[in-house]
């Protein structure tokens, strides 16, 4: 087709549109998974959270892909990604289940790029409270840094976090979900999306399409 971007989801199920999108346009080379993220604009700054829509129970490899995709997407919005892999556990305090998978994902990502500003696993308050984090865990490579990117351990926690923030903090501007990782700019809305939400996602999709046409390989949403 001739379209440069596609917005879907208002009158269809997420699961159906996600499956079709993946089958039609495929996943970006170098990745096995795609994801979505939300942008939160607040008085405390701009934050990026994911994966808020796609991967229900991500394993270590999926979390690695999500983190790498979010890292590139955050740069598109002219922010330097300082990333925390979220969990109920802190830096190996629980060694089984989800925390162990998150911990292993952090190890892989740090070995892959020693300059990458990412650490975890850690609880949300540890991630966002720089002074507390530096005092309790002085060994972290995020020492002295303000975290702006949160990779959640599963879809339930990320989705609930974004919904809770929208409900409890109406002054926070929430943008998303923004698809990251497919070969084309396909973005998803739902029946709860307002006109403003749809317009915002459409604007992001337009930027996404422009970046795609410039054949961006790293710092792009798709």
Give the location of each predicted region:
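Anion-binding alpha/beta catalytic cores of soluble intermediary-metabolism enzymes, centered on
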Residues: 1-144, 148-222
């Amino acid at each position: 087709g001739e379209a440069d971007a596609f917005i879907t989801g208002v009158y269809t199920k997420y699961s159906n549109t996600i499956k079709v999108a993946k089958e039609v346009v495929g996943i970006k080379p170098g990745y096995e998974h795609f994801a979505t993220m939300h942008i939160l604009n607040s008085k405390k700054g701009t934050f990026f959270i994911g994966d808020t829509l796609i991967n229900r129970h991500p394993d270590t490899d999926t979390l690695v892909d999500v983190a790498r995709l979010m890292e590139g997407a955050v740069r598109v919005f002219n922010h330097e990604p300082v990333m925390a892999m979220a969990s109920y556990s802190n830096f190996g305090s629980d060694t089984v289940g989800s925390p162990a998978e998150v911990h292993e994902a952090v190890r892989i990502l740090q070995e892959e790029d020693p300059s990458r500003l990412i650490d975890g696993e850690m609880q949300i308050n540890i991630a966002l409270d720089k002074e507390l984090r530096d005092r309790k865990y002085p060994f972290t490579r995020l020492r002295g840094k303000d975290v702006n990117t949160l990779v959640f351990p599963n879809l339930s926690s990320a989705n609930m976090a974004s919904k809770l923030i929208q409900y409890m903090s109406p002054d926070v501007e929430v943008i998303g979900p923004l698809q990251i990782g497919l070969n084309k700019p396909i973005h998803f809305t739902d029946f709860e999306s307002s006109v403003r939400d749809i317009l915002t996602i459409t604007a992001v999709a337009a930027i996404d399409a422009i970046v795609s046409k410039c054949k961006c390989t790293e710092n792009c949403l798709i």
